[in-house]
Amino acid sequence: RICYSHKASLPRATKTCVENTCYKMFIRTHRQYISERGCGCPTAMWPYQTECCKGDRCNK
């Protein structure tokens, strides 16, 4: 799986992952502000929410 792996303020980067999912994490009240992206599907703590997907570069 190829996932985007950059933090919000950094240039776009990708990473080849062994996990079968990618994620993007954002603040629940501001879905347009994505704080980070990466491999897997971690559990988020309030006020963050994780959105996971299966597909190359699906966490845009």
From Swiss-Prot:
Keyword Chloroplast: no
Annotated region described as Important for binding to L-type calcium channels, given as residue ranges: 41-48
GO cellular component: extracellular region
Pfam family, one: Toxin_cobra-type
Subcellular location: Secreted
Keywords of this entry: Calcium channel impairing toxin, Cardiotoxin, Disulfide bond, Ion channel impairing toxin, Secreted, Toxin, Voltage-gated calcium channel impairing toxin
Matching InterPro entries: Snake_3FTx (IPR003571), Snake_toxin-like_sf (IPR045860), Snake_toxin_con_site (IPR018354), Toxin_cobra-type (IPR054131)
Tissues in which the protein is found: Expressed by the venom gland.
Leader sequence segment: none
UniProt similarity note: Belongs to the three-finger toxin family. Short-chain subfamily. L-type calcium blocker sub-subfamily.
Protein name: Toxin FS-2
